[in-house]
Amino acid sequence: MPKKILVLHTGGTISMQADDSGAVVTSQENPMNHVSNPLGGVEVHALDFFNLPSPHIKPKHMLALYQKIKEEADHYDGFVITHGTDTLEETAYFLDTMEVPHKPIVLTGAMRSSNELGSDGVYNYLSALRVVSDDKAADKGVLVVMNDEIHAAKYVTKTHTTNVSTFQTPTHGPLGLIMKYEILYFKTAEPRVRFDLDRIQGLVPIIPVYAGMTEELLDLLPVDQLDGLIIQAFGAGNVPKETSQKLNALIQEGLPIALVSRCFNGIAEPVYAYEGGGVCLQKAGVFFVKELNAQKARLKLLIAINAGLTGEELRAYMEG
């Protein structure tokens, strides 16, 4: 029997076209729906699930994708999601933390619209179909396929505003490569905690630190309306002295605060014991999130809060 793959189109550049002025605009009809399937033994069904530029994607849309995949799990052997690249990594990470079926799930997109010179959409789409129909993809977690590379949802990030090789995995490198005749994997997926949520809500902003930062910016936050806070810290995980004093006060008020590094490579860890250093921050109750960027750490905290995690259980999850 042929493998059945469900494609969920959500919009983004891969579905768009450039108009006469060169501006890229939303298309009424997704050009990927007209791409012929060259893969033998693979039956492709496509659904226009959303038609949104990815800056318009919210956690509620990510949850809807998860629920659709669960709903269709018994009818399909794998799932491809076409998505705008600006928030693709966040949707991929969200799905990777959910109790998705043990079947391949691949996200892909494009950096150039369908009628631009050098358009990459069709190639990435067909590459995603190749990966999702490959038996080796089933135990790799949620994947991102772009530009002949396969990346783990947890680690991949968009690194360039326009380059077709924008999706990279800092520190680790790609999970695998798409070759002319075969698909090669370097690594296996890591075990992870998964959740089955039926709602996702809450306010968790991201605050980057900078030289000379004081408590004034944090004072402007509507703390009584916040569910958590992500701090994008210096280096291994440090903040200015005045900022740390305010963070300590917020933690005392019961606000969960998680920290990542603003560095592109490396992992945040408590190293320095001066005021504002990571050692002091962790002792005060700040969670040090390993190997995630700020936008994914935000989703991780939001998911944990919606799953009802608190206290040491929340700390263990955020720092695990």
What is the predicted role of each segment?
Residues 2, 8-12, 28-38, 152-231, ...:
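Accessory alpha-helical/coil subdomains and C-terminal extensions
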Residues 21-29, 93-105, 121-127, 158-164, ...:
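A glycine- and small-aliphatic-rich helix-loop capping segment at beta-alpha/alpha-beta transitions
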Residues 107-178:
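Internal gly/pro-rich beta-alpha loop/helix module
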Residues 241-320:
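ATP/nucleoside-binding phosphotransfer catalytic cores, i.e., glycine-rich phosphate-binding loops
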Residues 1-70, 245, 265, 288:
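ATP/NTP phosphate-donor binding region
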Residues 8-10, 81-83, 106-109, 143-147, ...:
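Short beta-strand segments
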